């Protein structure tokens, strides 16, 4: 569900804000969606992020070139799993979901900036 919400909103954000949307708004939206759904459904934060990464990875395979599609998929799975671990660890230390989302957003935003600007 979080992947569907993110997909629909990301299309609007990317049309309106281009690279800035991808490096600032998309990570915020995705971290909010993943973590909010995990809390709402009382399920694993890390697991939710992992499944999101798998869904994004499948999307990457079908929408990227054959040369980079599989690597983009691996990067999606690993990065979203990492963001899930960051979210979980921050939440267990602070017990404040807003702080957990904020910290994971910073990491996610930094990752997207690196991908957009350096790769």
Each model region followed by its residue ranges:
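Hydrophobic alpha-helical segments at protein termini of multi-pass membrane proteins
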Residues: 1-119
């Amino acid at each position: 569900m979080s992947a569907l919400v993110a997909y629909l909103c990301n299309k609007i954000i990317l049309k309106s804000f281009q690279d800035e949307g991808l490096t600032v708004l998309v990570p915020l939206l995705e971290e909010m969606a993943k973590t909010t759904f995990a809390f709402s459904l009382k399920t694993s934060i890390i697991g939710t992020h992992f499944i999101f990464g798998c869904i994004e990875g499948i999307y990457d395979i079908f929408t990227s070139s054959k040369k980079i599609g599989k690597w983009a998929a691996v990067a999606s799975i690993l990065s979203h799993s990492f963001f899930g671990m960051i979210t979980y660890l921050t939440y267990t230390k602070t017990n404040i979901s807003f702080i957990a989302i904020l910290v994971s957003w910073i990491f996610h935003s930094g990752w997207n900036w690196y991908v957009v600007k350096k790769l």
